[in-house]
Swiss-Prot record:
Compartments where found: Nucleus
Gene3D superfamilies attached to this UniProt entry: DNA-directed RNA polymerase, insert domain, RNA polymerase, RBP11-like subunit
Chain positions covered by the region annotation Disordered: 203-226
NCBIfam families given in the database record: PRK00783.1 (NF001988)
Binding positions for Zn(2+) per the UniProt entry: C88, C90, C94, C97
The species this protein was found in: Bos taurus
Role summary: Core component of RNA polymerase II (Pol II), a DNA-dependent RNA polymerase which synthesizes mRNA precursors and many functional non-coding RNAs using the four ribonucleoside triphosphates as substrates.
Protein name, as recorded: DNA-directed RNA polymerase II subunit RPB3
Taxonomic classification: Eukaryota, Metazoa, Chordata, Craniata, Vertebrata
Any single Pfam family the record assigns to this protein: RNA_pol_L
Any one GO molecular function term: DNA binding
InterPro entries found in the cross-reference section: DNA-dir_RNA_pol_30-40kDasu_CS (IPR001514), DNA-dir_RNA_pol_insert (IPR011262), DNA-dir_RNA_pol_RpoA/D/Rpb3 (IPR011263), RBP11-like (IPR036603), RNAP_Rpo3/Rpb3/RPAC1 (IPR022842), RNApol_insert_sf (IPR036643), Rpo3/RPB3_RNA_Pol_subunit (IPR050518)
């Protein structure tokens, strides 16, 4: 049973963008729950409110607002300190629950002006577009193709707006998803036949495969159960990958603790009712 197991974790790779690790001695349901928490339950900061004061570009206001919301913002240093806006006592926005951004760009040249994430000015140095994280004071040190394009302006066109970033999680909206991708596998040699290959010899082998070069898949094991899970968690840049993992596990632990507490109250209530 899953609750009787003693899982072990082994990290195989850790970079600024992703973390790879292996969990053993656990259940498929638990492993998939962890994967889902990575995606949907880890809070980050994202733009959620936009007031457009001037927009003469070819894109409607709604297009621009949606693009702004999907720009990843650095959240490592502030997400735990920021309140959810629904829990804040302020009437609209305040430093306790939001971060303000402004953008004011006008094209005065014949050449097309690219409005990008670098044009977003934050009132907090801890929350900036991820692509601006390593930018120096000299603009020549930062190439434009690294920035996220918002809209293109021609001569005489302008875009001026104010926006607020708030704390949220992926279950509310995809813009609060801290991951660019979360993958896990549990049968690298296809011994459980969870996938039927038309031509097994043509399929690329998993990086975790233990087969010899001349083997395409392991012999079928009808009694086998997945107990080892290989994860690859890639961050969108808002949080470091190890922060995503630790925050997700902490959140899952809290959910289980709350469930246990609530269940205990229900049982006690039933006992009192019977008596």
């Amino acid at each position: 049973m899953p609750y009787a197991n003693q899982p072990t974790v082994r990290i195989t790779e850790l970079t600024d963008e992703n973390v790879k690790f292996i969990i053993e001695n656990t259940d498929l349901a638990v492993a998939n729950s962890i994967r889902r928490v990575f995606i949907a339950e880890v809070p980050i900061i994202a733009i959620d409110w936009v007031q457009i004061d001037a927009n003469s570009s070819v894109l409607h206001d709604e297009f621009i607002a949606h693009r702004l919301g999907l720009i990843p913002l650095t959240s490592d240093d502030i997400v735990d300190k920021l309140q959810y806006s629904r829990d804040c006592t302020c009437e609209e926005f305040c430093p306790e629950c939001s971060v303000e951004f402004t953008l004011d760009v006008r094209c005065n040249e014949d050449q097309t002006r690219h409005v990008t994430s670098r044009d977003l000015i934050s009132n907090s140095p801890r929350v900036i577009p991820v692509t601006s994280r390593n930018r120096d004071n000299d603009p020549n040190d930062y190439v434009e193709q690294d920035d996220i394009l918002i809209v293109k302006l021609r001569k005489g066109q302008e875009l001026r707006l104010r926006a607020y970033a708030k704390k949220g999680f992926g279950k509310e909206h995809a813009k609060w998803n801290p991951t660019a991708g979360v993958a896990f596998e549990y049968d690298p040699d296809n011994a459980l036949r969870h996938t039927v290959y038309p031509k097994p010899e043509e399929w690329p082998k998993s990086e975790y495969s233990e087969l010899d070069e001349d083997e395409s898949q392991a012999p079928y094991d009808p009694n086998g159960k997945p107990e080892r899970f290989y994860y690859n968690v890639e961050s969108c840049g808002s949080l470091r990958p190890e922060t995503i993992v630790l925050s997700a596990l902490s959140g899952l632990k809290k959910k289980l603790s709350d469930l246990q507490t609530q269940l205990s109250h229900e049982i006690q209530s039933d006992v009192l009712t019977i008596n």
